[in-house]
UniProtKB/Swiss-Prot annotation:
Annotated transmembrane regions: 48-68, 84-104, 122-142, 147-167, 184-204, 219-239, 249-269
Name this polypeptide is given: Chitin synthase export chaperone
Disulfide bonds: none
Signal sequence interval, chain numbering: none
Entry-linked Pfam families: Chs7
Keyword Transmembrane helix appears in the UniProt entry: yes
This protein's GO CC annotations: endoplasmic reticulum membrane
Species of provenance: Aspergillus fumigatus (strain ATCC MYA-4609 / CBS 101355 / FGSC A1100 / Af293) (Neosartorya fumigata)
Function text: Chaperone required for the export of the chitin synthase chs3 from the endoplasmic reticulum.
Principal cellular location given in the protein's record: endoplasmic reticulum
Quaternary structure and interacting proteins, as annotated: Interacts with chs3.
Length: 331
């Protein structure tokens, strides 16, 4: 396999784009690379569902993403709150798109299928770019939550989405000099650039923890996220067909990759949540007993005035009689 070719990748991993790249079949005339093994379909309520196990994990991922978003939104004054929540919104959109594709809501060989796969690729690139820009927020190079910070991350993510979407669509449709057999640009955008973005983010967070934080526990979150992410990629691209054969086509590497990606995203949240401190003076907590009185006021700071006016409707009021000697009379 030459650089930028998907032949060996698609023979092991049943990726959605594999049916849109590669040489044309001499029999059917359609493009696509058939994997050695892929998960069997399941029938539910007279509906055929592709990749049932992976689709189930996508649904779990949606629920977990909603929980993480709610937790981020509850930290009103946390550093990088608006920036990191953009990352989770993009991940939610990517999960929904992947669920639609993997479950067969938009089946392969259908007209809209190339467009959905192009959107999936675009969201994948946007997600990695958003993660990259989030890596700079902790260094306070610019104030977080401002117009510059929020729209910088939104615009860069949108630009990478458009670039990846267009390259994918041009490749699938043989437009602009690209073709399903000329996939170098697609490979660079999906794998090389995304890998560079993730690597830079990891380096930035390591520098942030080592140079600015006394606590080293966040390194555990980073390490666990990296390990599970790498395991998911290895299981997908290295052992997907082996797993599929050994479990009688009930699972394949896509299931494990989806699950490991979810764990990696959760570690991104845990890392951000751990290193983020909130200004409690201006926050609105969702937990009871957020505030705690540590000690009573000193005795000398308490009011010592005794109120004697029992006829007033305000038990706490006091009337002082003026003692004037004007004109020799007391008033």
């Amino acid at each position: 396999m030459g650089f930028g070719q998907f032949d060996s990748i698609c023979q092991k991993a049943a990726l959605p784009l594999c049916s849109l790249v590669g040489p044309s079949s001499p029999i059917s005339g359609s493009t696509g690379i058939i994997p050695n093994c892929y998960a069997r379909n399941i029938e539910l309520a007279n509906t055929i569902i592709f990749e049932g196990a992976a689709s189930f994990v996508h649904i779990i991922a949606l629920g977990m993403t909603v929980i993480m978003i709610l937790h981020v939104r509850s930290k009103f004054t946390a550093v990088g709150r608006k920036e990191i929540i953009t990352f989770f919104y993009i991940y939610m959109a990517l999960t929904i798109c992947s669920l639609v594709i993997d479950a067969g809501v938009v089946p392969p060989r259908s007209g809209p299928f190339p467009y959905f796969v192009a959107v999936q690729n675009g969201l994948s690139s946007a997600l990695c770019t958003c993660l990259l820009i989030n890596g700079f927020v902790g260094f306070q190079l610019y104030e977080d939550g401002t117009f510059l910070s929020v729209w910088l991350i939104r615009l860069t993510s949108a630009v990478m989405f458009v670039v990846s979407f267009l390259i994918s669509l041009l490749t699938f449709k043989s437009w602009g000099g690209m073709s399903p057999t000329n996939t170098i640009a697609l490979f660079v955008v999906l794998y090389i650039l995304n890998a560079i973005s993730i690597a830079i983010y990891l380096v930035m967070q390591l520098l942030l923890v080592m140079n600015t934080l006394e606590d080293r526990w966040p390194l555990g979150h980073i390490a666990f996220g990296v390990i599970v992410f790498i395991c998911g990629q290895v299981l997908l691209y290295g052992f997907s067909d082996t797993i599929c054969d050994n479990v009688q086509h009930y699972l394949d590497g896509l299931f494990f990759a989806t699950f490991c990606n979810l764990l990696a995203v959760m570690m991104v949240y845990k890392f951000w949540d751990y290193i983020t401190k909130e200004d409690l003076e201006f926050s609105v907590g969702i937990k009871p007993n957020t505030w705690e009185v540590k000690e009573l006021l000193p005795e000398e700071d308490r009011r010592t005035t005794v109120y004697q006016d029992s006829h007033s409707e305000y038990a706490g009021s006091m009337y002082h009689h003026r003692a004037s000697t004007y004109g020799g009379h007391n008033y």
